[in-house]
């Protein structure tokens, strides 16, 4: 079983190894506001208190060091999630739901879903 501390340390290690500055959003703020600035090699995430926050942090890291970040916005989002899936120590139904909800907000299409499915099948 992966513990919260393992997930938090994993995010910190990736950021340290890749010279990514991390800003932590206050937990007092109700609405999560994650973002990545590849030019500044900086991300904003919530403290890694659960799997959802963990995979969201990995997704933001994916915008900086993941593949295909030169695509259109939808492609960038998809490939940042692929990076998160590839890198995660654990991928749970919660992680999958968060990814699906995020991609729905970008109106992903069947071709994008097929890329995700193909990729996910290789991770099993």
Residue spans for each PLM region:
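Long, well-structured alpha-helical subdomains associated
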Residues: 6, 14, 48-49, 89-124
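Short, conserved micro-motifs enriched in small and acidic residues
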Residues: 52, 56, 74-75
């Amino acid at each position: 079983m992966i513990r919260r501390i393992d997930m938090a340390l994993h995010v910190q290690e990736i950021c340290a190894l890749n010279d990514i500055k991390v800003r932590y959003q206050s937990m007092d703020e109700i609405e999560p506001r994650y973002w990545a600035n590849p030019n500044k090699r900086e991300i904003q995430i919530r403290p890694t208190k659960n799997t959802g926050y963990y995979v969201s942090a990995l997704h933001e890291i994916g915008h900086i060091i993941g593949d295909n970040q030169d695509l259109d916005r939808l492609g960038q989002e998809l490939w940042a999630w692929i990076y998160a899936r590839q890198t995660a120590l654990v991928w749970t139904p919660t992680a999958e739901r968060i990814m699906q909800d995020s991609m729905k907000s970008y109106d992903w299409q069947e071709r994008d879903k097929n890329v995700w499915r193909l990729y996910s099948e290789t991770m099993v």
